[in-house]
Design a protein with these regions (language model features):
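Membrane-proximal N-terminal amphipathic helix
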Residues: 1-25
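Periplasmic/extracellular, small/polar-rich flexible segments of pilin-like filament-forming proteins
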Residues: 20-114
Length: 114
């Protein structure tokens, strides 16, 4: 279930990098990432995407909120954050994914231990 967000994140990472590369600032509204103003996503497991301005040390960040129905109790309604920690230019960046709400057991291996 969480891996669906990981797969979806690639497109949103690209949008965020492009916006940051153009303006030097983070998007301020989710429509800048190509989703509607409510952040709604047509997905089996992911309910919405939002911007996250509180992740410590991040240049920019976005987060997925998981659906509450038909989900593992360890994931239902919880958030997974993707944070751009360093913009290296030329369309690339260093990323972290993490969650303070989802136990390590449920996180994809690339998100564990962060």
């Amino acid at each position: 279930q969480v891996s669906e967000a990981l797969n979806m994140a690639s497109a949103y990472k690209g949008e965020l990098i492009a916006k940051y590369g153009e303006s030097g600032t983070c998007p301020t509204v989710v429509t800048d990432l190509g989703v509607d103003s409510f952040g709604a996503i047509n997905s089996k497991y992911v309910h919405s995407i939002g911007l996250n301005s509180t992740y410590s040390g991040a240049v920019c960040a976005f987060e997925f909120t998981f659906n509450t129905v038909g989900m593992s109790s360890g994931v239902a309604g919880k958030k997974l954050i993707f944070a751009m920690m360093h913009y290296t230019g030329n369309g690339s960046a260093r990323w972290e994914c993490t969650s303070t709400e989802i136990r390590q057991l449920y996180l994809p291996s690339v998100c564990k231990g962060i």
